[in-house]
Amino acid sequence: MAGKIKNNKDLIKAPAGSGKTTYIRNELKSICLNNPESRILCITYTNRAADELKKNLEGANITVSTIHSYINDLISPFYSHKEVLDLYWEIYAEKIKNRIKNVTNDENIKKSNQYYIEKYGELTEKAVQENISELSYGETPFTSLYTGKLSHDDLLMFANKLIKRYPILLRKIGDKYNYIFIDEYQDTSAYVLDIF
């Protein structure tokens, strides 16, 4: 199913305010009327857009979500798995090492490092790795490297790499949904578009 979804794309290009969201909502209604058993995923960029798409669609087999919320829901059950933690280290080990060393002598990093030492006793790569037993999504503009809390942007990048490494996650999407709609495509990260 995932392969079929990947090869069955329609792209609607139009300027802001031209009715793309209305078009998608009408398509959703049509599918619900003609194929009431269909399972539909509709993801968008903002909560406002998600709320707009949900109007008059209650009770249908439709999941409407923001991109970040959906991606987090998809991968969060695996945040404590060894393979996921290993991928985190593969991606962030160098950044963590540089932050520990604080070669730029950044005052904020210095304070952050001191706080970590006060909380955990020592600040080494090994200590950080041992203290991160599970990742999380922080809904913040920056990733908290020492705690495994992924930022708004890094969540999408991390999910992309995780799904590429473990394509079964993509199959979960394809097996669960007959249709996938992405609203606000122009605002969507390339990492997400690459997934779908």
Predicted feature residues:
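Accessory N-terminal region flanking or inserted into the helicase ATPase core
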Residues: M1-A16, Y23, R39, N102-F181, ...
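Conserved phosphoryl-transfer catalytic core
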Residues: K82-K110
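P-loop NTPase Walker
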Residues: M1-K82
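Catalytic micro-motifs at enzyme active sites that drive phosphoryl/nucleotidyl and oxygen chemistry
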Residues: S30-L33, S144, L169, F196
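Residue-level recognition of alpha-helix termini/interfacial anchor residues
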Residues: P77-H81, Y92, Y166
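Short, glycine-rich nucleotide/cofactor-binding loops
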Residues: D187
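Phosphate- and divalent-cation-binding pockets in alpha/beta enzyme and binding domains
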Residues: E52, D73, K172, Y191, ...
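Walker B catalytic acidic pair
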Residues: E184
